[in-house]
Design a protein with these regions (language model features):
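N-terminal small-domain helix-loop-helix segment of the aminotransferase-like
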Residues: 2-7, 14-112
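Short glycine/proline- and acidic residue-enriched helix-loop micro-motifs
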Residues: 10-14, 187-190
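Conserved core of the PLP fold type I
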Residues: 67-193
């Protein structure tokens, strides 16, 4: 069992200050140090890498694809049609929204996907007055940095105090200002989708 004094001392030693503003990498570093100092194992979910073994079905499918030469060619620029279709079906099943498979763009991860999205938004909305991305919080902290690097304005909305109708009203209020070009919600449970 971890004791509060050890955790508090490490937070102070790492100069994290207000721990509620720590980044994902800060959390990862802290958990590694605490593991080493206490001998207590942690389940690492902070980087989206829980260390779970892939399913046998996935391993067999990957082996089959490699044996058939999939690594010898690049996939189509817009993505593999059956994967785009599956992504569309997933969104429909999970949150009940119809998304055209054409709008499902596969990436190697959420960092790459959001960076490409922010680049596209920056170019598509330049000079229109819609120059700000609304980032729903809690989200993926690196996205604010990505916007800064690109020069795309961003504003956050911490949904802790907004649920149901209150959230809808707040979103409508923010969008009504006329400067929002996109709303980004990276679910902390799995930012990659």
């Amino acid at each position: 069992m971890l004791d509060e004094q050890t955790v508090t001392a490490e937070i102070a030693a790492m100069q994290l200050g207000d721990f509620s503003t720590a980044t994902i990498r800060d959390i990862q570093s802290l958990s590694k140090v605490l593991e080493e100092k206490t001998g207590q194992p942690f389940i690492h979910l902070e980087m989206g890498v829980p260390g779970l073994k892939p399913s046998q079905i996935a391993l067999q499918a990957e082996q089959k694809a490699l044996a058939e030469g999939c690594a010898a060619i690049y996939p189509p620029n817009g993505g593999i049609p059956r994967i785009k279709k599956a992504a569309s079906e997933f969104v429909k099943a999970f949150i009940g929204i119809d998304i055209d498979p054409l709008g499902c763009i596969p990436t190697t991860g959420s960092m790459q996907g959001t960076f490409a999205t922010f680049m596209a938004l920056s170019h598509a909305f330049r000079g229109t007055g819609k120059d700000t991305v609304l980032l729903i919080q809690p989200g993926f902290p690196v996205q604010t940095t990505q916007c800064d690097v690109i020069g795309l304005r961003h504003v956050g909305l911490d949904i802790y105090n907004y649920r149901g109708e209150a959230l809808i009203r707040k979103l409508e209020e923010m969008v009504a200002e006329g400067n929002i070009c996109a709303i980004v919600y990276s679910n902390p449970n799995n930012p990659s989708w």
